[in-house]
Amino acid sequence: VNQSASASSLSASPSSIELRSGLRMPYVEAGDGELLLFVHGSLCDYRYWQPQLAGLSKRYRCVAVSLTHYWPATDSAADHPFSWSNHADEVAEFIARFGAGPAHVVGHSRGGCVAYHFARRHSEHVRTLTLADPGGPLQIAGRPPASLPETVNALRAKAAELIERGEVDAGLQLFVDSVSRPGFWAMSTPGFRRMATDNAHTLARQFRDPLPAYVPEDAADLRCPVLLIDGEKSPDMFHRTVTALQRWLPDARRETVRGASHGMNLAHPSAFNRYVDEFLLAMSAR
């Protein structure tokens, strides 16, 4: 997560696609060309990608989705499980029903993990994959099964507890600062704070559904071209994941957004958009 640009240039009333489950996935779109689909991370929704829709829609049909349970369709999914695995399959179903695939797919943070497993399971729906600071633990050979450090889990439990007690701002500050850098929540734009507050109800459910560890065997399954993007100032756990995936993936390149932390697509959108555009152009020329 990171601070959000204004969402004013996105349509006030998004479109949506109904899934087999009866849930709807809202989305906004801009531009024409090959389908470029954006998958948000924790506390976010389609509004997170406004600078990418503004900058990349000159060449691509840009579509930003809100995953099920997230704003603006927050109430409709209350009785359905909150699951990264379901989200991965729902991205595939969205592309199939949208009808313009296969897609170039960009995922950030938790959405990067969702996009990674979508691409592994549903290769027929993906042209290329871009993972920006993908979330989830890293499995190292010869070590016990990977999970997040206990200090991280304790912090996240405290954040969820604060939110469920009604101290939403304090809980969001604790979580957002932990995945970006201390003091970041206080400096965030009103647009980002509004988006995070709109999605605060998802945080406790997310923590009860831990992301799977990245392992070399899974990465070897992923045959599409992959662009890995990290922020120069992102927390070390993201750098370690990107470094490992760069080594494990059969067809990967890496770019680092200078001066940026975890929300590099918002802090430096022109650099982020340029890296994505150059990657897609290079892949189409192959």
For each of these PLM feature ranges, what is it?
Residues 202-218, 235:
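Active-site nucleophile elbow and catalytic-triad environment of alpha/beta-hydrolase enzymes
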Residues 216-263:
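Conserved loop-alpha-helix segment in the C-terminal half of the alpha/beta-hydrolase fold
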Residues 251-286:
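Catalytic active-site module of serine/aspartate enzymes centered on a nucleophile-bearing elbow/loop
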Residues 164-204:
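Conserved alpha/beta-hydrolase catalytic His-Asp/Glu region
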Residues 19-80, 94:
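Conserved HGGG/HGGXW glycine-rich cap/lid loop of the alpha/beta-hydrolase fold
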Residues 85-103:
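Conserved acidic catalytic loop of the alpha/beta-hydrolase fold
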Residues 100-144:
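Conserved hydrolase catalytic core segment
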Residues 1-37, 58-61, 277, 281-286:
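Alpha/beta-hydrolase fold catalytic core
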